[in-house]
Amino acid sequence: MATQILPPGEFIREELEARGWSQATFARILGRPLQTINQIINGKKAITAQTAKEIAAAFGTSPDVWMNLEMTWQLHSTPEPDGRILDRVRQVA
C-alpha cells in the first residue's frame, strides 16, 4: 500500500483546528499577512526556511519537521525528469 503524501498545509490546517486557531490568528502570531498563510495552507506557496522556523516556534516543534514536509511534498508533486537524460549521459560517456 502506497503512503499518501500530503502538502504541509494540511498538517498546519489540522494543527490550527486542534488549537482552535483561525488562519487570521495564526497569521497574527507569525506576523505574516493572512494571504501568505492561506497560500501556504492551500499549497500555493512553499514553506521557506524562515517560515519553517516561525511555524515551529508557534507550534513548539522543530523547523526540520516543516522543511521535511515541504521537501517531501515538492519531490512528490514535481514531475519526473525527462527519461532521455540517461541516454544523453551515455552519449557523453
State where each predicted segment sits:
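A short, Lys/Arg-rich alpha-helix, primarily the initiator
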Residues: 1-21
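Residues within the helices of the helix-turn-helix
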Residues: 13, 24, 53
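Residues within the alpha-helical elements of helix-turn-helix
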Residues: 18, 29, 58
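Short alpha-helical DNA-recognition segment
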Residues: 21-39
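Residue-level detection of the helix-turn-helix DNA-binding "recognition helix"
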Residues: 31, 42, 71
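Short, basic-rich loop-to-helix N-cap that marks the start of a DNA-contacting helix
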Residues: 44-59, 74
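Short amphipathic recognition helices of helix-turn-helix/homeodomain-type DNA-binding modules
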Residues: 62-91
